[in-house]
């Protein structure tokens, strides 16, 4: 079928993020006094901490164990295992300066997306160079990386795919991956504060790429830091959207973009703490955004008369913790901590061998007795949420579904529509699919397809109709047995991201709904950041089309949903029960509950955040008496 509106989804998000950027910029430029800036910072910090909601979790014993220690010229290194949650083991390396005469400042170095994690070459170079010159460094393996790899992806060491699988599943029952990742970092700060070798009044934070993202988030969550330096991560969300750059699950904090915040607000939240916004000129995290945030931090830091001013640094290389950045961050931290570096050049410092950095048996936390994986903890938490659910009436179920979908309060009857070129239903027949584009002032909503034997230049009118919601595109209607619609007009809806509106964004090789970095992943993530849901954006089009049919006299609809369309069909049957007389579901997916804690390729675009707090989609199907075939 024609893909006439492949850019419609992308352009909607570009417009939204540009609007939000412009509004936020005006608010920032209006901050002229220290009091105004600090009040803005206070409110940003409050909202961010509410969203991450980590203070509710108990600070259980860390139970740290040193499993190995090595001495090198200029520094020593300890291999450590600690528990950020009971039985949830974190593997770490602590680098300490040689010839210590007392507690020293420390840097918590958060790892980016590298399978070697705490053992990656550039990161280790930063760690040994910093420790040799007088400041300790603690670096740990994130979940699914290094010694904490999760063996659940068909033996494929795809750490980003593992992160994104966990990320989409957490949303179903009300958690999110940025908070999940931040918890390990907060507990690592706890660990540093317990160490007699560390001056707990002088803890600093850095990380590159995904570690730079986590540095940005944790900066707003942690009061015990004296300086932060996110690397190769900070930009403007507008730039990410404009550049069609899908980002990782930990880079998608829910709601905040829609509330007018941006990445910079996680840095502003800690003012007057000094921040170095670091990056590289040829970075896929747009350097224009990095530098604009850096200038913004310089301006606000000056307004509040910060003792050490925030600033930014841009290296000449592609995305990575390159040498110039390492040196700039290191110099920034020595200034912030008041430590005089010992003048030892990074090139002259020996690096540990790979096996010398392993903390767990054979470098695998799953060989530690009693280890609990992230998947196990997720499943336990999800089950607890499900067990706490209350029975809901059909009307109550409709209300919570609207809430999770983030639907607007009222979806009006479309005032107009466009008549599109015809499509021949089956080659060799005279059956014609008439196509109509329904839109509102914000965006294109859906393409309504109508199978008739003639060219209909207006949406055909009928009292009874069959409505088909496809898995991928309405061309699937060609395979639908005639018995489903005989004697009635068969309508089909290509809603947002479906059929005529399948995205052509984010590269030609990334258009499968289950891709970890495809267009569907990208737009689902942006929806979450805006406080919306991609299924909600899709449902708005479906419900608008039904309103149009109802206004033209349609009274009864038999609804047929296939594959992912079965889920949307279930939502439709509940929210348009005044029209939907019968619901038939073909090739229906599994329950959402069954996804949690498993490897799966269910599309992020089909994930409905928070729904498992109230019901599963199969519970809704039961409530509308859906027929499964």
Describe the residue ranges of each PLM region.
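Alpha-helix capping and helix-loop boundary segments enriched in small/acidic/polar residues
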Residues: 114-125, 157-161, 172-183, 205-216, ...
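Cap/lid segment of the alpha/beta-hydrolase catalytic domain
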Residues: 101-186, 191-194, 234-246, 250-252, ...
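Primarily recognizes the serine-hydrolase "nucleophile elbow" in alpha/beta-hydrolase
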Residues: 188-259, 545-614, 619, 623
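Alpha/beta-hydrolase-fold catalytic nucleophile elbow
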Residues: 141, 206, 231-232, 278, ...
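Short hydrophobic alpha-helical runs that function as membrane-insertion/retention elements
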Residues: 137-141, 226, 276-279, 490-493, ...
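Alpha/beta-hydrolase-fold serine-hydrolase catalytic core, especially in secreted/extracellular enzymes
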Residues: 1-89, 102, 119, 271, ...
